Curated annotation (Swiss-Prot):
The chain crosses the membrane at residues 17-44, 48-72, 159-196, 249-287, 356-380. Keywords: Membrane, Metal-binding, Peroxisome, Protein transport, Transmembrane, Transmembrane helix, Transport, Ubl conjugation pathway, Zinc, Zinc-finger. Residues 1-16, 73-158, 288-355 are peroxisomal matrix. The lineage of its organism: Eukaryota, Amoebozoa, Evosea, Eumycetozoa, Dictyostelia. Zn(2+) binds at C406, C409, C426, C429. SUPFAM superfamilies: RING/U-box. Pathway: Protein modification; protein ubiquitination. It comes from Dictyostelium discoideum (Social amoeba). This is Putative peroxisome assembly protein 12. Component of the PEX2-PEX10-PEX12 retrotranslocation channel.
């Protein structure tokens, strides 16, 4: 796993590509797993249905708190700390061999004049690219020659870096997921044919109209009461009516429909550029042409390094001091023993969440697999014998000896249809009889046309 870091002249604290890949995919893999757990729980307890309906908002709200906690006390995100990584901010990019990255390489290719092939030294753009890659490797080898000097050039992330990191870790993935979901829903062929979206829009408009009507009726009922509280309530309801009218207007506006059409045409290209940019950075990181695994790290000028013993000890000191300060803060409160226990439990949950969360998902999936295996391997009961066929009622039609004949028309059956009593007739014959008499012509058992079932026979 770490074999890419054993080469001579390389930074031993630089995470391998597989470490970066695993930590980058860790949190997105938790999201569907946790949603599945709450979906199963909501089927047994309706209280969890609210979490399922607003799962994205609940998930990213908790993720915001979790990531802030780890960025503040562990110098890295939840998944980065799980793989013993930390965020550092290099003071000098060139000293770390990152001055020549994707942007500088593109600049060299784009800014290269068209007459670059003329003169005493003729270089094509492919040669410039090769020389740029060679320069990157030389800079990296020179920078890693003195590890102590390299550590002095790094500094811890600040509060501004943590806030900016929360935008890239939580807000952007949230809005990206919402845009993907909206595009998938609106680009559905059924929605384009008006079989999905139009019905939803009509239902939404009907709900808005009903809400407006209910609010107007409530205002009229309270018009006769002169009270300051009632007046304030009426004002709030009037504002809500105006807001609902605005929503109804926006949903039916042509401008919004044009913007929606433009979005459906442009968003696939924007999403492709977004994914391609991540792929290019990951490819460059794999071949050690950059120390930035994602463009977000490049925008922030932040790199990931492995934790050393000094970092782990400093984290322990910070955590112990934090717990002591919080306990001392609530010790003077009334009922301090309860709050002291609560603070200790919350701190333990946050600090050990990197073990609790994966373990809980693993245990749940293991239990699900165990019970599903038991259901599959459990002895199955024998198939119950079919009930005996109904007997002919006195005065009922005779059953023909030739099974291919219809008891009603006494001709070979066409479009065979079975009745609730178990006898087969022609569809036109049995439909007309049941529609008129509401009973089986042989057994006189009550039936209706909805209980008739067509049979498709093989030739």
């Amino acid at each position: 796993m770490f074999m890419f870091n054993f080469d001579n002249g390389h930074d031993p604290n630089r995470p391998s590509f597989f470490e970066m890949l695993n930590q980058h995919q860790m949190m997105p893999s938790f999201k569907p797993a946790l949603k599945y757990i709450f979906t199963v729980l909501s089927q047994r307890n309706p209280k969890f249905r609210y979490i399922v309906n607003y799962y994205d908002e609940c998930f990213y709200s908790l993720l915001l708190l979790l990531e802030y906690h780890y960025l503040k006390y562990y110098e890295g995100s939840f998944s980065e700390n799980f793989y013993n990584l930390k965020r550092i901010k290099p003071r000098n990019n060139n000293a770390n061999g990152d001055g020549d990255t994707l942007f500088s390489l593109l600049k060299r290719l784009v800014v290269t004049p068209s007459n670059a092939g003329q003169g005493p030294e003729t270089y094509t753009k492919s040669q410039i690219l090769k020389k740029s890659f060679a320069m990157i490797r030389r800079n990296r080898a020179a920078a890693s020659s003195s590890q102590q000097a390299k550590d002095d050039l790094n500094t811890m992330i600040q509060d501004s870096d943590r806030k900016e990191s929360l935008i890239y870790l939580v807000l952007i993935p949230y809005f990206k997921g919402k845009l993907d979901e909206y595009y998938k829903k609106e680009s559905d062929p059924l929605a384009e044919l008006g079989l999905v979206s139009s019905d939803n829009n009509n239902n939404n408009n009907d709900n808005i109209n009903d809400q407006i009507q209910q609010l107007e009726e409530q205002i009229q009922q309270q018009q006769t009461i002169v009270n300051g509280n009632n007046n304030s309530n009426n004002n709030n309801k009037k504002l809500k009516i105006k807001f609902l009218i605005l929503i109804r207007f926006l949903k039916g506006s042509k401008t919004l429909k044009k913007l929606k059409t433009i979005f459906l045409k442009v968003y696939p290209f924007i999403s492709a550029i977004y994914e391609a940019l991540f792929f290019i950075y990951q490819l460059l990181y794999l071949y050690e042409y950059t120390n930035y695994y994602t463009p977000f790290f490049h925008f922030q000028n932040i790199q990931l390094k492995r934790l050393n013993h000094k970092d782990i000890e400093s984290h322990r000191v910070v955590i112990s001091n934090r717990r002591r300060d919080r306990i001392n803060f609530v010790r003077d409160w009334p009922g301090s023993s309860f709050f002291v226990r609560l603070v200790s439990i919350l701190d333990s949950i946050l600090d050990y969440s990197k073990y609790i969360l994966p373990l809980s998902v693993f245990i749940f999936k293991s239990l699900e697999w165990w019970y599903s295996e038991n259901r599959i391997s459990a002895p199955t009961l024998p198939i119950p014998t079919p009930p005996t066929p109904s007997k002919r009622a006195p005065g009922g039609l005779e059953i023909p000896r030739d099974k291919r004949l219809c008891p009603l028309c006494l001709k070979e059956r066409t479009n065979p249809t079975i009745c609730g009593s178990g006898f087969v007739f022609c569809y036109p014959c049995i439909f007309g009889y049941v529609n008129e008499h509401s009973k089986c012509p042989i057994t006189f058992l009550p039936t209706n046309t909805e209980q008739l079932r067509k049979i498709y026979e093989t030739v």
